Amino acid sequence: MSDESSQESFERPFRLFAVEERVLAQNVDGKVIYIGAMESKNGQFCARLDSGDLATEPRRSPELALKALVGKLSFDYLDGLFTSEREAEVSGRLQDYPSVEFELDES
């Protein structure tokens, strides 16, 4: 008999935000952390993380840069940042900034 519970996947929701020149992440608990920079040049946007060597190719909007960044993230990497980083201070409402919602598999 196989243990099916060990093969289940658990999707965990996250959000990324482009707040001015910063990239912020939010987990299901509502904790918001600073994870990198949003660079803009000649109408193109590039998301670059502070940890590791992760960056996106230039995109036409902050949302597209955030979406490109999602494909480079793993649950373990992002969850580790939430464990080690302190909460970011944000003035204003996060909902007013460009963002992308996504899920990462915990397994």
Predicted regions and their residues:
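Generic signature of intrinsically disordered, low-complexity, basic-rich segments
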Residues: 4, 21, 33, 43, ...
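Short aromatic-glycine-(Arg/Gly/Cys) micro-motifs in beta-strand/loop hairpins
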Residues: 30-54
